[in-house]
Amino acid sequence: MGKRRTRWPVPTYSRVVPSTSGRVLVVDDNKVIRQLIRVNLELEGFEVVTAADGAECLEVVHQVRPDLITLDVVMPRLNGLRTAGRLRSDPRTAGVPLLIVSACTQHEVESGLDVGVDAFLAKPFDPQELVRVVRSLIDAPVGHVRGPGDAEAAAGHA
């Protein structure tokens, strides 16, 4: 009677009750970070769905239909920047705001801007700043296209 191992990968898809603030898909391979982001957003009235990596994000994004997606950069199977590129190239998710929550290098910030990431938040992050950035991205006008000044502001969050 030893310990039983669970099969890998174990889906982390989870869902809470609907809310009025918006639905956020949180993608991070670190379970503690996923929970930290989830709890902070749920306390502010957001509905949160989680995924353990970019591949899982792409599997569930069309069922979840989030108002915003947070992505870590370094993840197994499919990293955050490649996931962002695939989300931007899909007409069904091209307009969903993307927030990178990661300890990014300048090169990763530039690569993120190139694939259409909307904002960056450095780890460790201030929970109030997380909520502020998520709210501002969800409340931005639909179809808002970043201008040159917006790219500099987005990079400033890294």
Question: Could you say what each language-model-derived stretch is?
Answer:
Residues Q35-L43:
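Charged docking surfaces used in two-component/phosphorelay signaling
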Residues E59, L81-A94:
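Short amphipathic alpha-helix used as the core "switch/output" element in two-component signaling
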